[in-house]
Amino acid sequence: MAQPIIMISSYPPRLCGIATFCEEAREFIQKAHPERDVLVISHTDGEGEGVFPIIDTSHRTWWKPVAQKIHELDPYVVHIEHEYGLYNYIDERGKSDENEGLLNLLEAVSDVPTVMEPHTVHGRLTDFEADFIFKMSRRINVVLFKCHYQKWRLDWNFRGRDWPTPMNVMVVPHGARPDRRYSLAEVVQLREDLGLDKVEHLAPHLVGLIGWIQSNKRWDILTSMWEDIAHEINERTGEDWDLLAAGTWRDPNHKPDYDRYRSEVELLEQKRLAHYYEFVPRGDVYYKTMAVCDFIVLPSTDETQSGTLARIIALNKPYITTAPMEGLTAQTLESGGGLLFTTRDMLRRHVIELACNEEARLRMGENLKRYLDEVVSWEIVAEQYSQAYELARESTRTGIPVELPKEF
């Protein structure tokens, strides 16, 4: 029997962006490797076939049973999804081990081909982040960054500290589904599926604020201006446009933001200018809720890359997002499928511009279709993962570190 591919990550039903990412990535990695099982070693709340829920970071030595399970399964490769909070042990004093347990795990499985996919790599690294990436990159065969700027900024960050730059970094973009494009007729049906056809005042055209409600997702920037924007659009085009705000909260720390944003939307709803739709942003309903919108606004104030944006791209939906904002800005420039704003006035202008210009929306949608088909489709990304796996296996076999060219 062929050796399995092992993913290490949080996993559903946990309401976590990395868990959702892993679930989707696993699907397409499995399609690319039908001869192998793709298994997951997850935290203790992970569930499902082929999932081993054994990561318990309440124990300092959580990594030991994980290393034992990896060796027991004898994998083709280990693929680790990384976010600092996922592998963080907190001692009885409330002190973090700063992912030391994860570094111990990498040393314990150094005989196994391993790649790691960090989901937070800032353009300007903190001392802690730089130290972790330095140590991690020396214990791993291949490091997978999401964006090209992260790789060339890493060189700048490390040279500024007089450190050697890791040469085993490969750029593999955040995957987006190639099978979630809907026709206009299907969008009408989706409104019915979601029950939106029963909202009497809901306009035929919708601007979407969709996804997890968090303090960094500043819905209030748009909601505070929406009444004026909607009137301006109507005066110019004679068309009615509404704001569709949809999602829910998952982090108790963000519940006050949820309450505030929702109350602002409900005030607009009383004026028949908006509608709030509560749902858990994962699975098909996430795509369907975005699909009924003409375009999406993603007003994020802190994000390196975005699962929400990946879904926007999958649907070929024009969008507006904040800049400069790490991967959001990079993918907007690369795709030509979105507009960027740095001020409230820019956001107002862009929303009105997109609502009044169907030709621009169609052009940006075509740009996103091309970007999806040629760059970020999960089918393409899964093949790039396969290339990384081969590099990791060859490095483990020969003992020669992977060395890839710099961006610049």
Regions found by a protein language model. Name each.
Residues 181-199:
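A short helix/loop element that forms part of the nucleotide-sugar donor recognition site in Leloir-type
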Residues 334-345, 353-359:
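Conserved acidic donor-binding segment of nucleotide-sugar-dependent glycosyltransferases
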Residues 247-249, 256-284, 335:
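Nucleotide-activated donor-binding/catalytic signature segment of Leloir-type glycosyltransferases, i.e.
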